Each structure stands twice: as C-alpha cells, then as structure tokens.
C-alpha cells in the first residue's frame, strides 16, 4: 500500500496518468520497483505504456521488456489510444512467430537465468530511467517452481537497486489476495480491476 508524505510530491515522477498521479499523491517515488497487478484485460499494458510515454515526453530513455506480447501487439494497443511507440525501446523475449513461441520460451532452450541475464544486459546497455517488465506470469511459467521464481524476482530487485531507474513489474492477479511475497518486495502495489458499468 502506498503512503507518501505530501512534502515529497515534487520529487515524484508522473505515471503518465493524471488520475493515478492524484491517487498516489503526485506520482511514484523514483528509482524504486512497483507492481501493477490485475486480471487480463484490466489495463496493465495501457497504463504501462502511459508511464513510458511520459518518460519519452520528458526526454528520458525508457525500456519495455516483454516476455508476453510482441512489439506488433504493443503497437496495436498504442494505436488504439492514438499513441506511437517511437522513443520506447521494446525488448522482446518472445518470438514474433506464434508457432515458435512455445519453443522459444521452453525451459530446455532458454533457462530462466539466461532470460534474466538478457534483461540485465539490455538495461546495462541502454541505461533507461523507466522500465516495464511484462510479465511476471511468464516468468512464473519459466521458473517451474516457486523457489526458482522467487530467486529470479529477488535477482531483478537486487539488480535494479543498483540502477537509477523506476521499474514497474506487470503481473496477472492469481488470487484475491495476489502474490503476497511479490507485494513484500515491491515499493508499492497498484491493483487494477475491470468494472462492469450499468447502463
């Protein structure tokens, strides 16, 4: 849960969503790791793109690491909102060919630690100030065990504490309470829900 003292507002960075910035008391504390959690279709990708586009608008380097969606799929989401991905470095760890997707991410061919190392290498090369990691659900599948998954998430956290960048991890909400271990290592958790509107 996010509880920010109000005098720190000037130091916070915008999420790219005025409404969310207002809820968060001005935005996010910089150089921290956050979790955006919600069911599929709740808007995680959209709100993640808003965060990066705000960075682009401010002249920052930004990185979208994707294990779940191709660049073409992200471009389609952006296009629906009238946005462009220009200025966003999209690092795909998913095959653009759906026929190959399962083999590309199969643990026998691409170990989880190798995937994590590729992310570290890309961040070190590009030195972004804003990073989206999409998504932890795929990392869970790659890990094949809760212990391996937790180790890799902790490795991500330890790596990013040495960088000057704000990181948002995207995750599907797997239960009503969410992933409590993941909540405990995140600086803040934003829960996204789909609401049915009565007409």
Spans of model-derived segments:
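Conserved P-loop NTPase
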Residues: 1-6, 11, 125-126, 194-199
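Pre-Walker A adenine-sensing motif
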Residues: 16-27
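Scaffold/interface architecture of coatomer-like assemblies
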Residues: 25, 33, 40, 191, ...
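Conserved catalytic network of the ASCE P-loop NTPase/AAA+ motor domain
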Residues: 26-29, 54-58, 81-85, 121-125, ...
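Conserved P-loop
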Residues: 33, 39-100
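Loop/turn-to-beta-strand initiation segments
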Residues: 61, 127-130, 161-170
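Phosphate-binding/switch loop-helix module in NTP-utilizing enzymes
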Residues: 99-161
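Phosphate-binding/switch region of NTP-binding enzymes
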Residues: 166-199
């Amino acid at each position: 849960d996010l509880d920010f003292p109000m005098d720190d507002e000037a130091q916070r960075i915008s999420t790219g969503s005025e409404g969310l910035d207002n809820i968060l008391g001005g935005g996010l504390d910089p150089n921290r790791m956050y979790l955006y959690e919600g069911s599929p279709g709740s808007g995680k990708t959209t709100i993640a793109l808003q965060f990066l586009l705000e960075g682009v608008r401010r002249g920052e380097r930004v990185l979208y690491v994707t294990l779940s969606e191709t660049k073409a799929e992200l471009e389609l989401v952006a296009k629906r909102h009238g946005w462009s991905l220009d200025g966003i470095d999209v690092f795909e760890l998913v095959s653009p060919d759906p026929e190959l997707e399962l083999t590309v991410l199969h643990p026998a061919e691409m170990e989880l630690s190798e995937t994590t190392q590729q992310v570290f290498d890309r961040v070190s090369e590009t030195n972004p100030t804003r990073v989206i990691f999409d998504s932890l659900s795929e990392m869970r599948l790659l890990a094949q065990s809760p212990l391996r998954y937790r180790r890799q998430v902790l490795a991500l956290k330890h790596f990013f504490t040495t960088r000057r960048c704000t990181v948002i991890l995207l995750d599907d909400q797997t239960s009503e309470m969410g992933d409590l271990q993941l909540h405990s290592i995140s600086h803040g958790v934003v829960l996204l829900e789909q609401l049915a509107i009565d007409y």
